[in-house]
């Protein structure tokens, strides 16, 4: 009996030892962070290391970025290869969405609800546009146009401009649900920027350049009447390269680079502030009754603006100001040595994020 029992015991011990080794080496899996609600598909990589850039400054990305945007408690950005990343503001962790990559990506625009992106890419040296849905990960090629933008009031609506060689160019409405175009207004012009700040209002202007005398036109879609906002003001010189930025509530900034002037208007087009400093509208963000702006501290008076700024030829020290829009008081909260800060976002009462075009980096700043 003992002669048969010993082999059986040996087999049992061998199986137990193998099971223990397998559990120690394989059975214990590393936990993978949960995906945020806007990423139902694709793979999520493990957290990447975040680089500390100073006591109050946190660099988010490791690779140069095309820019970023904020949605809920996440900061999303593309690197120069078209890979998509997101940073969790709650856990302070950075993740890569490995199921998404766009070749030849040169920029993007974000819808009001932050759920859709207009992707800007190049094909045979020609600018093209696609619509990317963050929830479904579906991509739709938009019809060939020269410029397209989201409306501020409906993420399924937008505005487009299309140049025509043998007839008048067209400004119209885009329906992003089926990628259809609806012509609304004919115009003899080319290379226009277009905006859709209100349901019955389209704004258009020449692409800003030092060599182009500027006008900013407000088109009432009900009456088809057009108003030139620039003609309502008297300037000591004709402004060129005028730039505009609309905020979610319909208010907007108007910048006159050739005159080094910056103005803030209400939704009703009433001039509220003529600031004592100059900066480019892309360097500002409005949050309730506060305006945050990164402003150059040294700007060559001979520089051709905004052309040299668009071309990345200007680097300068900057200050970030917090401006109270109720009384106009200005407070400096940060100063850089060399930077080109754009796309400020308010994270909390003492924290903002921004993108630096010089370093190609996204930063979190606590003040």
Where are the regions that the model predicts?
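Predominantly a core beta-strand signature of beta-propeller blades
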Residues: 54-57, 92-96, 136-139, 178-182, ...
């Amino acid at each position: 009996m003992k002669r048969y029992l010993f082999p059986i015991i040996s087999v049992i011990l061998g199986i137990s030892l193998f099971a223990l080794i397998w559990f120690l080496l394989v059975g214990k899996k590393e936990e993978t962070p949960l995906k945020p609600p806007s990423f139902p598909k694709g793979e999520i990589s493990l957290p990447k290391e975040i680089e500390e850039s100073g006591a109050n400054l946190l660099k988010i990305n490791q690779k140069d970025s095309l820019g970023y945007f904020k949605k809920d408690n996440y900061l999303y950005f593309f690197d120069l290869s078209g890979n998509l990343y997101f940073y969790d503001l709650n856990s302070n962790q950075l993740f890569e969405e490995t199921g998404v990559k766009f070749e030849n990506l040169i920029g993007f625009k974000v819808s009001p609800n932050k759920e859709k992106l207009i992707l800007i890419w190049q094909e045979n040296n020609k600018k093209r546009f696609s619509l990317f849905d963050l929830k479904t990960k579906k991509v739709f090629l938009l019809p060939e146009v020269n410029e397209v933008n989201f409306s501020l009031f409906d993420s399924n609506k937008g505005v487009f401009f299309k140049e025509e060689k043998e007839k008048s160019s067209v400004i119209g409405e885009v329906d992003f649900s089926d990628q259809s175009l609806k012509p609304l207004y004919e115009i003899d012009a080319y290379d226009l920027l277009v905006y859709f700040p209100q349901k019955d209002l389209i704004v258009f202007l020449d692409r800003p350049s030092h060599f182009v005398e500027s006008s900013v036109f407000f088109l009432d879609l009900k009456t088809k009447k057009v108003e030139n906002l620039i003609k309502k003001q008297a300037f000591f010189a004709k402004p060129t390269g005028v730039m505009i930025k609309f905020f979610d509530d319909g208010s907007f900034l108007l910048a006159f680079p050739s005159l080094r002037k910056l103005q803030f208007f209400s939704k009703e087009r009433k001039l509220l502030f003529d600031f004592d400093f100059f900066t480019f509208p892309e360097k500002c963000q409005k949050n309730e009754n506060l305006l945050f702006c990164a402003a150059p501290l040294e700007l060559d008076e001979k520089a051709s603006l905004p052309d040299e700024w668009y071309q990345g030829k200007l680097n300068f020290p900057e200050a970030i100001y917090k401006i109270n829009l109720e009384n106009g008081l200005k407070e400096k909260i940060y100063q850089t040595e060399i930077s080109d800060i754009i796309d400020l976002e308010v994270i909390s009462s003492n924290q903002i994020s921004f993108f630096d075009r010089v370093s190609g980096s996204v930063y979190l700043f606590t003040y």
